[in-house]
């Protein structure tokens, strides 16, 4: 593996997760446990990529509070170079999720107004321009405003660097709608793919055509424990994740898949191999209590990769 320069722009905040201990009872008090850590789609991916051996810089707005200090400490622990712009009079964004006993999401609340201040003007600052110019990969999540995502695509157009996106949620993925053609890859789940295209796929094999018609040249659509599909301009493939006997928490699994996929892409691996690496990274995260698994490493990824079947190439 060659160590690459990576810039990540997007969410770096506090994740709060409550896990219900028994069968979920809507509209009632449910016994459970509470857990808090640094998170965010971009930040989870940044930490994974750093643990896989790359030089990663994280750019994100932050409040001048203890939550911001928690995020900074998490960046340092993972080896991420922290490049925040801090608003001393604001609070750091947060994401609060309630999970069922099996780890699946019941409902979540995102308190993330601060990200609206990540304006296109921030991309014009000299330090940011130099950081982007020096990067082999630029990864952005949809916590950024739509106009900032569009400006980022325009700023990286005509270069050799890879530009990728993380959908974050069905409500936020539509922020990419004006700049899909400028992305090399977008990582999303099926609900996010539906929100982006306004269409329903009868089978996973239909997503590449639907997303290409929407203007996207490459991407990955995950479907929980069912087959995931990846595509680029010319090819597509389908892979079924291995069955997992125990599920710790689904939080961060999609971000991990993006990390594993992109790390393989930077190594020159083909589409099918990238999807296998992405699934392996997601498996590592699904077995971890953390949104960015501390066990993420090239060695552990290679070990889990042996459990992932070869993808089926689609015509």
Task: Report each predicted region and the residues it spans.
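Conserved phosphate-binding/catalytic loop of the ribokinase/pfkB sugar-kinase fold
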Residues: 61, 87, 97-137, 142
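Short gly/ser/thr-rich secondary-structure transition/capping motifs
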Residues: 79, 118-123, 165-171
